[in-house]
Amino acid sequence: MSDKPDISEVTSFDKTKLKKTETQEKNPLPSKETIEQEKAAATS
């Protein structure tokens, strides 16, 4: 085991093999309007 990582694989990596994916937020943050509505509903 050497201390230095083996970068030969990294340098020969083919980016064209990667697939483009659409990222989707799992827990999107609520908008300011939604927060205001929830605050108003909680106080009434």
Swiss-Prot record:
GO MF annotation: an example: actin monomer binding
Compositionally biased intervals (Basic and acidic residues): 1-25, 33-44
InterPro entries per UniProt: Beta-thymosin, Beta-thymosin_sf
Cell compartment(s), UniProt: Cytoplasm, Cytoskeleton
Region (Disordered): 1-44
Any single Gene Ontology cellular-component annotation: cytoskeleton
Transmembrane feature ranges: none
Keyword set, alphabetical order: Acetylation, Actin-binding, Cytoplasm, Cytoskeleton
Highest taxon, organism lineage: Eukaryota
Residues that bear N-acetylserine: 2
Pfam families recorded: Thymosin
Main subcellular location of this protein, as a coarse class: cytoplasm
GO biological process: actin filament organization; regulation of cell migration
Protein family (similarity comment): Belongs to the thymosin beta family.
Function, as annotated: Plays an important role in the organization of the cytoskeleton. Binds to and sequesters actin monomers (G actin) and therefore inhibits actin polymerization.
Name assigned to this protein: Thymosin beta-12
Species this protein is from: Lateolabrax japonicus (Japanese sea perch)
Higher taxonomy: Eukaryota, Metazoa, Chordata, Craniata, Vertebrata
